[in-house]
Amino acid sequence: MAQQYQPGQRWISDSEAELGLGTVLAQDGRLLTVLYPATGDTRQYALRNAPLTRVRFSPGDSITHFEGWKMTVQEVDDVDGLLVYHGLNGQHEQVTLPETQLSNFIQFRLASDRLFAGQIDPLAWFSLRYHTLEHTSRQLQSSLWGLGGVRAQPIAHQLHIAREVADRIAPRVLLADEVGLGKTIEAGLVIHRQLLSGRASRVLILVPENLQHQWLVEMRRRFNLQVALFDEERFIESDATNPFEDTQLALVALEWLVDDEKAQDALFAAGWDLLVVDEAHHLVWHEDKASAEYSLVEQLAEVIPGVLLLTATPEQLGQDSHFARLRLLDPNRFHDLHAFRAESENYRPVAEAVQELLDKGRLSPKAHETIQGFLGNEGEALLTAVNDGDTEASARLVRELLDRHGTGRVLFRNTRAAVQGFPERKLHAYPLPNPDEYMELPLGEHAELYPEVSFQSQPDVEEEHRWWRFDPRVEWLIDQLKMLKRTKVLVICAHAETAMDLEDALRVRSGIPATVFHEGMNILERDRAAAYFADEEFGAQVLICSEIGSEGRNFQFSHHLVLFDLPSHPDLLEQRIGRLDRIGQKHVIELHVPYLETSPQERLFQWYHEALNAFLNTCPTGNALQHQFGPRLLPLLENADDGEWQALIDEARAERERLEQELHTGRDRLLELNSGGAGEGDALVEDILEQDDQFALPIYMETLFDAFGIDSEDHSENALILKPSEKMLDASFPLGDDEGVTITYDRNQALSREDMQFITWEHPMVQGGMDLVLSGSMGNTAVALIKNKALKPGTVLLELLYVSEVVAPRSLQLGRYLPPAALRCLLDANGNDLSGRVTFETLNDQLESVPRASANKFIQAQRDQLTPRINAGEEKITPRHAERVAEAKRRLAADTDEELARLTALQAVNPTVRDSELVALRTQREQGLAMLDKAALRLEAIRVLVAG
């Protein structure tokens, strides 16, 4: 029968519940007009199938007048199609409230309210809500939360450092891994895990200007962190009172900040939880004076609780510079340089003794005496066991010494020697004749290192005489690419102009499919270029990158690198090779270096190869050698006789070998053990790879996409294209792009195809979609027909989902202890709870949908019977809720008590444990337990099942 509509009646939209209560304005022929006063919206509906539900309250319900006062309904009259409610107000006085005067802002979000208001959802949505609760709970309790969802290969030492640091309250540490070991990824993991856990909510990243873009790409591509890049232009153009307050993550160039006092004032006023400083070894400090950059970072470190400093290794820095970084972290502990030097000297024999134990499995009398003097009498029994060959005692001894390490808690430093998995490098050099066109060029700064730039900058260079038509390196490159057919080749050169010209040359002279990558391209253009290069079937054979353009990118699916020219600094050379030379690279790195004979290019090649050995190995001494020999090197590149040049090469080689020996003897194996995690990181890697192999996420996401009206279609193997459909339910679904996106659940695919979104449980699309499910009301009611021969037709079962809810700051991380897992209750007609015998999935398989109108009619007819049964469900579930809260309190107390005991014992032997850490942990324990005491039981969803 058609609905009877009267002006003034109150109805609610089934599809737009957020509009509040609607008022019927008019019925005109086949159209119905409804006003939603709360939002000011008007809707017109086809009369026959308007998606509306009549709002009808019952005795016992609490309702609100539009002026704000409330009443409890006792009776309901129907006067000419309009409802009039009679009942008691807050002062227990008899009042009358016509439905026309109901509050416009009433929304039916509580499951019971929506059920009895006729807002009944599809079965699929009820299942989606249940599974969302289960998956959310599982992730909040996972030890991988914040570590497993990153677009990077899981690497043991990085994961160990990230978990160790990110799980501290306001961590203050120095990340000083050798080049190529992934300090930026370690910092990103710490930031990501701290943000997800709630330990930090505002992060400030300070970097040198030339690294801003690299950080931006890394944070967005790897961690899905939307970092705001600040410079002078953005700061000035912002309309905000304080531009820094508008962003959660700010990326700022240190050079600009030092020169802009107004920006400094705004930065300090904004307030931050975590400060990250890259290239911290460039902050100059001396006992009598500090640079402006150092002083600024020092002031920030005084007011920001957490600090991460990314820096070169201590051995590269030298002791004084190393001390300068440590005093930024803890000025109370590291306040005296001379005392620090003495402490370091005293500790050196202990580190050497540990080295002996690790190498030989036993201790010499001298090493025994050294460790005994360090540990005192308490270490005697342990040393005796070690000498008796007890391997467990040896491991325990190393842990004891580690705890007493002067900087073991604040300094993490891994070396390539300690971390396995790096590929071998092979060098292929190609001396080529220097063309006359270059020989005739006037000399200038680096003119003969990059002669093509100088040549092309001349006026009136004709198209047919462009540099790439006569430069022998171009002919050589074409021949080399033909020889390496079907092999991916990365070409790097110093300048963007050279990269673009080379792409032209390959297209005109060879037809070899190539793409280019330079700093003039935006991120989307670079993504497309990288994707074209990564495509095995139809992609480019060669990617040509400029120096700056390739920063922050990972091309390790390739293992052939062409250095079309050589950079002027060894650090830049290492960065180039580092695009391919990474942990996880499965092939030998083939380095191809063409250079022009009898030119500065040839001399620079000799410098890097013969003096620095920078092609075949990493060169940790390169910066120091460049600083020492640079003033002599540059003039000799262009003008020197062979004897003078060879003398420089020999002198630099000898100095390099001396410095490398110093580095080796200065290695602190104990510190390396601590930084590497001694096996803990390996376990995390295994857990992440196991999680990657599970199908729970793709299965869940398909149901999420279906529910929200997102179309998915195959793109290629392991990849899908997502697009909003015409029936998209919620425009706020975090798809990322209204035009659609390409996604993959496969980590290896995501690493080679940066244009694809890597979907994990931590991805913003997943988290945002789950938030939409749980924050909305869809799926918290359902009615279904149950087909089960054991049930008498007409039998009504009631399935109730409850959640133990605690309202607390995210920084307390109470979700780890009391996650929102559903407490499920399945009541039969006699009030018995069958949930222990019938699982959710078993029940789900027996259910069929019921037309909405029929379901609504049934609910209204059964309202008086259902209401007391719903109330009885809470009584049934309350003991389980109490057990869950008690268990959460026990686990929280046990975890914090264990950590407090560990840190208290550690503080007795290692002063780098700050009092503030212990105070914060005790406060967190007290607050967490107090909040858990207030945990409440909330009815999350109701499903009514009718046997048929």
Swiss-Prot record:
Motif DEAH box location, chain numbering: 278-281
Protein family membership: Belongs to the SNF2/RAD54 helicase family. RapA subfamily.
Residue ranges of every copy of the Helicase ATP-binding domain listed in the record: 164-332
Gene that this sequence comes from: rapA
Subunit structure: Interacts with the RNAP. Has a higher affinity for the core RNAP than for the holoenzyme. Its ATPase activity is stimulated by binding to RNAP.
Any one Pfam family match given in the protein's UniProt record, by short name: Tudor_1_RapA
Helicase C-terminal domain span: 473-627
GO molecular function list: ATP binding; DNA binding; helicase activity; hydrolase activity, acting on acid anhydrides
Top-level EC class as recorded in UniProt: hydrolase
Biological role stated in the UniProt entry: Transcription regulator that activates transcription by stimulating RNA polymerase (RNAP) recycling in case of stress conditions such as supercoiled DNA or high salt concentrations. Probably acts by releasing the RNAP, when it is trapped or immobilized on tightly supercoiled DNA. Does not activate transcription on linear DNA. Probably not involved in DNA repair.
Keyword terms: Activator, ATP-binding, DNA-binding, Helicase, Hydrolase, Nucleotide-binding, Transcription, Transcription regulation
Gene3D superfamilies for this protein: 2.30.30.140, 2.30.30.930, 3.30.360.80, 6.10.140.1500, 6.10.140.2230, P-loop containing nucleotide triphosphate hydrolases (3.40.50.300), Tandem AAA-ATPase domain (3.40.50.10810)
GO BP: regulation of DNA-templated transcription
NCBIfam families: PRK04914.1
Enzyme Commission code: 3.6.4.-
Residues annotated as binding ATP: 177-184
InterPro entries (alphabetical): Helicase_ATP-bd, Helicase_C-like, Helicase_RapA, P-loop_NTPase, RapA_C, SNF2-like_sf, SNF2/RAD54-like_C, SNF2_N
Tagged with keyword rRNA processing: no
PANTHER family assigned to the protein according to its UniProt record, in alphabetical order: DNA ANNEALING HELICASE AND ENDONUCLEASE ZRANB3 FAMILY MEMBER, SWI_SNF-RELATED MATRIX-ASSOCIATED ACTIN-DEPENDENT REGULATOR OF CHROMATIN SUBFAMILY A-LIKE PROTEIN 1
Protein name: RNA polymerase-associated protein RapA
